[in-house]
Amino acid sequence: PRGLPEGAFCGAGIEQLCLPSDFHNIGPRACENCKSLVEVNLMGTEITALPSSTFAHCVALNCIWLPPRLTLIGKEVSLNCVALQEVVIPTELSDIGNRAFCGCEQLQRFAPLDWGDIEQWVQAEHNAFFMCDKFEKPQWVELLPAEGPDSDAFDEELYHEYPISCQPMVDSRW
């Protein structure tokens, strides 16, 4: 099965990401810091987890369509995606990581295509939606209690944009 390796498009000037059906995985930081990325559509893929920082700091990102078999959204997946307004989720989603949508100031819609499809609770780390000023948590999202000595700590440097030195990878296997 094909997939995007870690940092595949990190810092690249791509505007859209739409992966074909034979993609089964995506690496951490695959599209981190893609300042021009506006839309992500993974609906046709077999991806079951989004690892950490997949789309972090994509400041123009407006909409993400997640794949139907996705069960896990990792930590800081969309950290500081300040333009993100909509995330279309699958009904299989069960876990949302720490600061997954932290700083997504415009986030308003986080839902499946059909509201009737939600059959289970989605567990989210306690600050998964921190600094999402326009977001109202759906009743089917359960925020987990904070754990550990640093669980309530929030590092301002994570929220603010920072320079990332990474080069997009070119791989003929894609």
For each predicted feature, which ranges?
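Structural signature of tandem-repeat unit edges
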Residues: 1-3, 11-25, 35-49, 59-72, ...
